[in-house]
């Protein structure tokens, strides 16, 4: 019995295909663009006769189907430069794919010999038909909410996620952006303001101030 689950309950995700009464594939799964609207996706499989399970209860050991990304940053020169972060983006990742659900029992992660347990995670090739790469308009993003403070970077790494949530994206191999004028290749964008610091005085150097700015 393949099962799909998110952190808030059973859900209909994409389009499910069936064979011999079992759901085998979720097609067209697409994570939300806004971080705060994304959900985790868990899958599990078990089978057997009812009489084999104590009290008729079937144990299900769920696996995370998505990749979790947390972004951390620091400022190498906090004494002379101030960096204020107000948003982040993951750009040009694939945004839609099909997931083949497990067809064998997802075993318990807690085993006497963890090295012997090869069934802890879903294989990367469980996801196929990746679409949407190199499309900047569909970037995953998180912006500072009105109630959030601007994040001022220090010389220690800190999360710039504006909360406990993490990006939940389709696992995939990425080709990095090459730093040219090309619009292809994956990259992380940080929306920030950078200022030179002299005592208690600051002068903005990025983005370049306009004449109308005070």
Question: Where are the regions that the model predicts?
Answer:
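Extracytoplasmic cysteine-anchoring/structural motifs
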Residues: 1-214
């Amino acid at each position: 019995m393949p099962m799909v689950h998110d952190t808030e309950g059973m859900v209909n995700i994409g389009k499910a295909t069936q064979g011999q009464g079992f759901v085998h594939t979720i097609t067209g799964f697409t994570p939300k663009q806004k971080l705060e609207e994304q959900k985790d996706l868990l899958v599990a499989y078990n089978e057997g006769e009812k009489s084999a399970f104590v009290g008729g209860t079937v144990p299900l050991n769920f696996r995370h189907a998505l990749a979790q990304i947390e972004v951390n940053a620091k400022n190498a020169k906090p004494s002379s430069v101030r960096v204020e972060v107000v948003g982040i983006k993951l750009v040009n990742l694939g945004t839609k794919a099909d997931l083949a659900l497990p067809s064998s029992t997802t075993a318990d992660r807690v085993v006497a010999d963890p090295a012997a347990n090869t069934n802890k995670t879903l294989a990367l090739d469980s996801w196929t038909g990746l679409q949407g790469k190199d499309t900047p308009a569909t970037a995953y993003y998180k912006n500072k909410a009105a109630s959030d403070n601007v994040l001022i970077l220090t010389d220690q790494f800190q999360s710039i996620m504006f909360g406990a949530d993490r990006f939940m994206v389709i696992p995939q191999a990425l080709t990095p952006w090459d730093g040219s004028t090309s619009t292809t290749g994956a990259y992380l964008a940080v929306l920030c303001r950078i200022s030179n610091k002299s005592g208690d005085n600051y002068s903005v150097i990025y983005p370049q101030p306009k004449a109308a700015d005070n």
